[in-house]
Amino acid sequence: MTERDLTTPSIDPISDILKWVLLVTAVACFALLGWATVLTYKHAPPQPQAFTDRAGNVLMTADDIVAGKGGFQKADLMDYGSIYGMGSYFGEDYTASTLVRLGVLTKQSLANSGETPPRTKAPGNQSLAITGPGTPPKATTPGAASPAEALSDAAITATMQKQLQAIDLTQSKVVLPDAVAQAIRGVQTELTTKLNTVDLSAGWVPAKSLDPVLRKQTADFIIYSAITTVARRPDHPKTSWTENWPYEPSVGNTPTTNTFRWTWISFCFTFFAMGFVLWLYRAYLDHPDDEPMERGLAEYRTLTPSQVKTGKYFIVVALVFLASQGAGAIMAHSYYEREYFYGIQLNYILPFNFLRSFHLQAPIIWIGLGWIASGLFIAPAIAGGREAKGQGLLVDILFWVSLFVVVAALVGNYLGIQGVIDKGWFWFGNQGLSYIQLGRFWQILFFVALLSWSGLMFRALWPSRDTLMQATRQFWTGNIRLEHLIWAATINVEVLYIFGMIPLTGIHKSFTITDFWRWWVVHLWVEQSFEFFAVAMSAYLLMSLGLVSRKLAERSVYLELILIFLGGVLGTGHHLYWGGGPSMWVPLGTMFSFIEVLPLVLLILEAISQHRLIKGAAAFDYSLAYLYILGSAFWNFVGAGVFGGGTLNAPLVNYYEHGTFLTLNHAHTSLFGAFGLLALGLIYFCLRYRAGPDAKFNETPGRIAFWCYNIGLVMWIFLHFFPIGWPQLDAVYEHGFAWARSQAFYDQYLFWQWMRMPGDVVFSAGALLMCWDFVMKLRQPRGDRDQLLPRAMPVAAG
């Protein structure tokens, strides 16, 4: 950056106003989130000291439930099935299937106390016989039961629902009706046996990390979790601790009025807010940009030692990316051939929960390393080619430390799941929480690596005492610039990661609280800190290549960050609708999560404008990098906006959709499409800068890979996610969530499970080509840089 860049004060009154609005918004949002945190702790489902039958026999205790939660995490069951709809979609949802079994066995016990067969009356001209979660309710004709039987059956169903709903979890000692107590004993036996029984037809091998006592306690935790979904809150007699989720009408779980009301209010609010944001864009951002342009990155400077050393980061990104695709391919195959992988028995060697654990963490690793390396490469260029002493050595150290943490953590994950790491599973094994499976020791080291990245970015952006003092003076006088925001984004990433380590030295007794903090990392990383970094870095690149002025770039970033904080922080609530938190998460989550769509609309508008600028340039060296960056803006809007915030976040939609293949569709298109493509675009930017002004930079492999990714994503959507996800949503509505998540349901759609393969082939071909392209470009000699040649500068056509 030039001396003028460092000293020129901000003279844009609109930017000055937006800075203050951003500050107030950020403080207010996190203050509200703090208040909501207090309420979540206060209103989480309580754990009675004991559940007993009427004779005083203890069925399970609070200690059993807490130990069972530890067993659930230790065995990483969240990466085989799910709890409260959170986790893997391969196995059953333990909460829903257990709830249905409790209803079935309670009803059978009630029926056996008399002589009435266990049927339930269904709407219309049919009755439904309650079965297990792996079998849809069976329709029978009215003639199948006499009027007296039907009346008795309805009475038994009503009694079963009343007894389950009347369980008062606020009591220190819960005395259960005989029928419910007998049902719990039956489910305890079933679950304990299932956890220790090989079932290759379901892709399940016994949880090696669970001993007999811990298996029974894990069953107790699952049963308790199921009870929280049907037991009513004392202050809301029509609402369970999970807002009546999952949808299981057989036990009386249907959407609440709260869910229905706030869905429609949020839709109205969204359309109003979208109109307001579009007006702001037209009024203050969408006008001719006649301000002076800066072209700091348009000049190819001699590479600094640290820039040269980032090449090995890009190689690791490529390798982890390929490994992630391999794990994903095996997982996808497991849905349609659960016993074997093309005749090879992998379930014992590579159990599904380990594959999923790796597949979830791998994108975080390669996207994170891509951003870390790109940031470390671009920062010295931002500083004008200057570098602090020892920066190259520190970049090397960070690489090897990061590589050690990644490899050791993944090995620990595997050994923990396989039961090799027993007593130290929490610290060195697998924590069993989706996306943050790393053992706590590895989490701490990972946090240290992130902190080191921020420190290195700080040294790279302001390498001398003079530049640091000037930047500090700018910041404290309110002249906050894009360079400050880029560094603040790195701090934001690591600060939010801290909350995934609460409590630091052990597990929390409540899954509701554990999952609350998990979403602080997963959601706030993606929807707030990742978006923060993406917006700030993308805007700086545009500005420093002379495509937009600093004034317009900073205006755009401030406005987008305001919307990102509004939607990203409090929008966390849409993940907390059904996990046992207070009912206020429904209005809070839906209103603010719909705001997440608004910055994505701005991203699309800006992407269109950027595309026009690049197309209007006669020469632009970074067209390949910007192809990926524009692609990330598109998929951010489609994956996170259309398939996520614009539809699935609505409470009434989410009530039925939560935990289905439509969520997988949202996850794949938004994580890779939005942030993966951005990471790859930044890497291609660095590779082009690294090649120098006179190098022959072949863009063809990168372009082919880009279109392979896009075609692969589209094929996944229309040949896999939609053909399974939409019928699955129908199945939830017609038969309940447990049936829609059963293997019996999936077996009806084996053809569409197989149709995942074409998209995998196309996508993987792009990945292989791109990784080869990375290697070739890193081996390419760097061009002459003795003179600063502004070849990267866009030149007006004509």
Language-model region placement:
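Membrane-interfacial, low-structure loops and terminal tails that flank and connect transmembrane helices
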Residues: 2-13, 287-310, 466-480, 613-621, ...
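Post-cleavage N-terminal segment of exported redox proteins
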Residues: 2-61
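Hydrophobic cores of alpha-helical transmembrane segments in multi-pass integral membrane proteins
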Residues: 19-39, 68, 72, 80, ...
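Soluble extramembrane regions of membrane proteins in the secretory/endomembrane system
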Residues: 42-259
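Hydrophobic or amphipathic alpha-helical targeting/insertion segments
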Residues: 77-83, 88-117, 143-158, 162, ...
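Membrane-interfacial helical/loop segments at transmembrane boundaries in membrane proteins
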Residues: 341-347, 421-432, 512-514, 518, ...
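Non-cytosolic membrane-interface motifs at loop->transmembrane helix junctions
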Residues: 428-439, 513-522, 581-592, 659-664
